[in-house]
Amino acid sequence: MNIDELLKYRKELLEGATDEDGYISQTSVLENTLPSLVETKLIESEIINIVPPSSAYSVVGFSENEAGERLQLYLVDLDSVALSAADEVIIHSRKDHHSSLLKSGLDFIKKSVKRHLNDEIQDSDPLAVLCHKLGSSVYVDQIDVIEVILLSTSISVESRGKEKTPKRFFFDDEELKVSYARNRENLTKEILIQYKLIDIGYLYQVSVSQGNADPLKVSFEETFGSHIEVLKAAEQKHFESYLCVLPAAGLCNLYRKESSRLLEKNVRSFLNFKVEANREMRNTIRTAPEKFIAY
């Protein structure tokens, strides 16, 4: 993978998102890239809520995972969505530009949770639905993770002298402390905010990798706080299996970070808290964990 290959792929991607009048919209670029996000299990479905790009805060879409505890917010880098954009606009060796756009997503989340946008965003604005959701105590109680996903048709590079090579940019997670009410009780919780950059390098890798573009990597020491002792159970030419005991708190933390990337659809359906039985099990775990194993 080199810069010329990425520039060619970018041109093909944007041409595919161009309408009959020669116009490239943010939403058409987003819709054309959703299959790649499903392929890497970053999202569960191509069906998302589209928000016209004229709305505030550059949010062009949002979705929830099947279990209902993860909100995904989609932003598009408007500066990058132009076939004629200059190299200095689409080739980045620093992630400051992307960080600024991702933080605008966090700004929208914070203001919505605090209901500061109720007067600013009209009810007729498609973004108002999400804004009102985030301002609801019921919804805040339900959501544990918010992913801010920035789609940019730019190319991330590492500069070494005059030579530029493709690179992936990563962004640190953070915790957002929120206050809400449940059953007349004032509560606080921390929502995990994750930032994801989907750029040309990422999309190109998906297109050529045949499903292996973004393998899931887990640091057990970071996730579980220590190394994990295992016992080899079976060994064949191309396969090994191990037995181990994993702490429940670590598994919870792992699912919180990776969610649907860990699970096949049948398991995701089992964990769907919109189903009454699953919702009651979740309530038992939260409010009376000592009863859960017996149940």
Task: Write out the residue ranges for each language-model feature.
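A sequence-level detector for short glycine-anchored, His/Arg-bearing signature motifs
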Residues: 290-295
